[in-house]
Amino acid sequence: EAKGAFGDAAVFLERYAPRARHVEVQVLGDSHGTVLHLGDRDCSLQRNHQKLIEEAPAADLPEALRDDMLSAAVRLAQSIGYRSAGTVEYLYDPASGEYYFLEMNTRLQVEHPVTEAITGIDLVEWQLRIARGETLALTQSDVQFDGHAIEVRIAAENPAENFRPETGRITLWAPPAGVRLDSGVAAGSVVGHHYDSMLAKLIVHAPDRAGAIRQAVAAIDAFAVGGVGLNLSYQRALLTHADFQAFRHHTSGLPDMFPEGWAQPTPDARDTGLAVMALHLHLAPAGASPWESLGSWRLTAPAGRPGAASYWATSADEPIRMSDVPGALAAVLPDGQNIEAEAPALTGDRLSGRIDGVPFSRVAHIERAGHHWRVHL
């Protein structure tokens, strides 16, 4: 059959490893015979063979096996006189302790920033310098590894609806501060259906894996986007899942992690209360002073925000009741929980105030959606 279809009777057999981990090695080779490895990465969290979250180094690998993988990658690149940045990919079967060659990608991978984070080496720069004929100004002993890095792929899709693509105009793009974000979009960008759904890569770096996970979760929580839905909540669920944190995940492990599928989580009480406060301030600003009015006024005119108002969340049976109290706003949720913010203020897309005496300031982007309002925190 192979002879008839391809003119070659050779058949290439691959080992079937249903619960494998995807481990890859970054290499650099110049035109003067030098080849180095820059450590390994783990890319085992995948959906339909598409990577979701990557990290470096690959955690929980036996050190002897890691050394063998790294050495094999260097020998492979040396044997073909490889020149450039490249990635040697393996499948590792924890059950047998064996690993198998998968492929070599002769380019920079999407996930190369995690290697840059732990080595401090600019891979794009060295790819260009090697192409110009320069000699690698590094030895293998110069390559040192510092801490742990995680990359989260941010895509315009709805995981709760079978990863349906999201399209539209981005009305708010407020990424978190203090982390690396590789992206080519901004507020006003139009997300269409003609291209890949990935809009950005979020990269964090910490002294250890647990710290990197915490940083990634905090960055996702601080990321505010409007106009187009993203997979942020899904990626957060992966990062906080016990299987990922204990390194029990594998390339086909998503059904094990979410056996009944994944549903968009319900906002917690604090976020719900703050969202309604932001909308309340947006719809009924406090400044009703006659001295700030350009027209005539009378004593019976409305004097600022109403003392109380009710708001219904989508599909809710009971309203969220908002009331002005001296120097504060209080939101009473349908379940009776009370969220009170002192000195609340909405300035542009930022809501600020104090809760239990602790100051807060966060993005609160409000947009009209037909007969509804959307608040993006």
Language model segments and positions:
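Protein kinase-like catalytic core scaffold
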Residues: 23, 34-37, 98-103, 180, ...
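Catalytic cores of soluble metabolic enzymes centered on carboxylation/carboxyl-transfer
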Residues: 113-340, 344
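Flexible glycine-/small-residue-rich
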Residues: 27-29, 40, 92, 106, ...
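Conserved metal-phosphate-binding beta-hairpin within the catalytic cores
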Residues: 12-17, 22-29, 81-109
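ATP-dependent carboxylate/phosphate-activation module, predominantly the ATP-grasp catalytic core
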Residues: 30-71, 108-123
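Structured, non-catalytic alpha/beta "coupling" segments that mediate domain-domain communication
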Residues: 161, 249-250, 356-377
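A long amphipathic alpha-helix within ATP-dependent nucleotide-binding catalytic cores
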Residues: 1-6, 10-16, 55-92, 219
